[in-house]
Amino acid sequence: MTTATLHTNLGDIVIEMFEFQAPKTVANFVGLATGTKEYTDMSTGAKKTGNFYDGLIFHRVIEGFMIQGGCPMGKGFGDPGYKFEDEFHGELSFDRPYLLAMANSGPNTNGSQFFITVGPTPHLNRKHTIFGEVKDAASQGVVDAIATTQTGAGDKPTKDVVINSVTVA
């Protein structure tokens, strides 16, 4: 099983990836995280590779709901310069906390943004691709700490919560 570890300034979040239920989504995340997938730099328009998520922030945090990251602009409207289709699997539903899923702006608009739930969110079923889960207690504690951080306008944390790097094993 593939795992991805988000190394944040508040601690590490280890995620078990659902590569069998959401293979394209996992491949996209892993490719962006490890620098093997090409993306478009939103500030220059140039095509590039590199560790996409390194240095990005959790730009949206809603206590009791989710933490969201993966926007290269840090505001929620950025993407890697492409979109891809949803992957819904009958075995996966938003019936528990700590699920990793793609943020989107409608059907088949996945890119780089993702979120981790902090409670059951069944209203998201068949709207967002679930592609991983935070299983260990220490990692869940980091998610909870991020989810309860102070926020300001637009649900943005008042102090940046940074994804320093992502490792995949």
Residue ranges and their predicted role:
Residues 1-169:
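Cyclophilin-like peptidyl-prolyl cis-trans isomerases
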